[in-house]
Design a protein with these regions (language model features):
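A short, structural micro-pattern
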Residues: 2, 32, 79-84, 191
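Conserved "right-hand" nucleotidyltransferase catalytic core of DNA-directed polymerases
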Residues: 106-114, 121-245
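Short coil/turn segments at beta-strand junctions that form active-site/ligand-binding loops
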Residues: 34-36
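N-terminal, helix-rich and Lys/Arg-enriched segments in bacterial and organellar proteins
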Residues: 8, 41, 46, 234, ...
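Nucleic-acid-processing active sites and adjacent nucleic-acid-binding tracks
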Residues: 15-32
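Active-site-proximal helix-loop-helix substrate-binding element of RNase H-like nuclease domains
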Residues: 18-20, 38-53, 57-159
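Gly/Thr-rich phosphate-binding beta-strand-loop-beta motif of the actin/hexokinase/Hsp70
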Residues: 1-11
Length: 245
């Protein structure tokens, strides 16, 4: 996102599928795009909201200002409806948290190492990754003759996102399992799914937590806690308890 340029690059999953470049797409073009199952990288915290803003009619300048607010962690710059534009977020479901650029370097190095263990399809995809810097100031308008250069830079990020997704399919399978157990979606965050799995639909589970005064000795246990401990730790609970002296 630049003051005068808004690019959306994407591709259909699979070998040989070309990257589609959308230069300053209209709201109707974005509306058509979000009908697809979109997989992005950190899209829940950035891309989804930029695309949703365009869908709502934001101009390029307004998109740029929104982008700066998101990057600078400004409050009240996210759209609640935008989070679920994507099918899933690669950054969030990956157990290893690092930037896309670091994934580009790591996967490219691994793909070019003949002794590394990697699926042939993933290796071929990773070898296409070209890590380079754009070399243009992000806060300045881009001359129209350089728009293709910027689009090519975005192509690399699309390929890197697909490669990162396929190189971490094990993590995605784990996300699918967690989503099923929690009755959620693969686009929900790991944190929200874990919370939902443990506490269900209770949004204020703290009210059910068991608190006690740690400065006071334990003289007795509630029946449910006692039953749980006897089942979970029978050997420990078989020991005689004489209480505090």
């Amino acid at each position: 996102v630049f003051p005068n340029l808004f690019l959306v690059n994407w591709k259909i999953d699979g070998e040989g599928k070309p990257v589609v470049r959308m230069i300053n797409p209209t709201p109707s073009e974005i509306e058509d795009l979000i009908q697809l199952r979109l997989v992005g990288f950190n899209c829940r915290r950035y891309d989804n909201h930029i695309m949703y803003a365009r869908l709502m009619g934001y101009t390029n300048e307004q998109l740029f200002n929104l982008s700066q607010k998101i990057i600078n962690n400004s409050p009240n710059c996210f759209f609640g409806e935008a989070y679920n534009i994507s099918f899933t977020d690669v950054y969030d479901f990956c157990s290893k948290k690092q930037s896309l650029k670091k994934w580009e370097i790591e996967l490219s190095n691994k793909a070019n190492d003949p002794y590394s263990k990697m699926d042939d399809e993933v290796r071929a995809l990773c070898k296409k990754i070209k890590h380079h810097e754009l070399g243009l100031p992000w806060d300045q308008p881009v001359p129209e003759e350089l728009w293709t250069k910027v689009a090519e830079y975005c192509d690399d990020d699309v390929i890197a996102t697909e490669a990162t997704y396929k190189a971490n399919l094990g993590d995605f399978v784990a996300r699918e399992i967690l989503a099923e157990l929690a009755n959620g979606s693969v686009n929900d965050t790991t944190n929200s799914l874990t919370t939902k799995f443990i506490f269900g639909k209770n949004r204020n589970p703290q009210s059910e937590f068991m608190y006690r005064d740690l400065s006071e000795p334990v003289t007795e246990l509630p029946d449910d806690a006692l039953a749980f401990l006897k089942e979970a730790k029978p050997e420990m609970m078989a020991e005689p308890f004489h209480g505090p002296k």
